[in-house]
Amino acid sequence: MRLAQPLYMAWCVLFVAAPILVVCAAALNGGRSMLFPPEDPTLARFTEFFVTEEVWTRALGNSILIATASAALATLLAWPVAYGLWRTGSPLARALAGAGALPFILPPIVFGVGLGFQWSFTGLLGSLPAGILSHAALHLALPLTTLSVGLAAIDRSHLDAAATMGATEGVTFRTVILPQTLPYTLSGFFFALVLSFNEFIVMFFVSASAYATVTLQIFNSLRNGFTPTMAVGAIVFILASVLAFSLVARFGDLPRLMGADESRR
C-alpha cells in the first residue's frame, strides 16, 4: 500500500511529461521528419523558427502582437464592468458582466463563425485589428473574473478609513483599490494572454487566411506532414504557458484565484 501511491504518482507524472519530452526531443531532428528518438540532433529547426523562415517568424510576431494587445484590451474593458458590479451591483452592471462572460461560454466554433460574418460585413475580415478585438471579446471573462475576486477581497475597513480621512472616491480608487487589486489585474492579463497565444478556432475564422499565427501556421504545415519546426512551435507554447502561470503565481494571489478560503490560509 505504501508503494502504491508513489507508483501511481510516478505514472501520472510520466503520463503528463512523456508527450512534452517527445515533442522537445523531436524538435532536434536534423532531417525534415519528426522522429523519436531524434536523428542527427541539431538546433537548426530553432534557427528556422526564430530567424530564417519568414512564415514562422511572421506568425510568431502576429501571435505576440495579438495576444498582448487583446489581453491588454480585455483587461481594460473588464475593469469598469467589474468595478461597477462590485460598487453598485446594479442590473446594468450585472447585464454587462453576463455579456462579457458569454463569448467564453459559447462553443468557440459558434463564436468564430459569428465573428467571421460580422467582420465580413464591416470589411475588417482578415485584418489584425479584427483578430485583436475578437480575442479581447473571447477572453474578457478571464480578467473580469480575477478582478471580481480581487475587488471582493478588499478590506472594507480600508475604504472606511480613507473616507474618514476625507479622501474622495477618485483618491480612494488610486490609493486603496488599485494597489490591492494589482495582483488580480496582472493575473487576468496573463490568463488572457496565454489563452490568446494558444487559441486556434476563432482565429481560423477571423484571419480568413490573410495572415497566420503560430497555431494557424502549425495547422497549415500539416499538409506537408509532421515536421521538427512544428515541434519548436509546440515548445514555444509550453514555455509561454509556463512563464505566464509562473508570473501569476509570483505576482498574483493564486490560492484565492483557485478558490482557497482566506481563513484557512
Write out the residue ranges for each language-model feature.
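Loop-to-helix entry region at the N-terminal start of transmembrane alpha-helices
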Residues: R58-N62, F117-L142, T146, L182-F189, ...
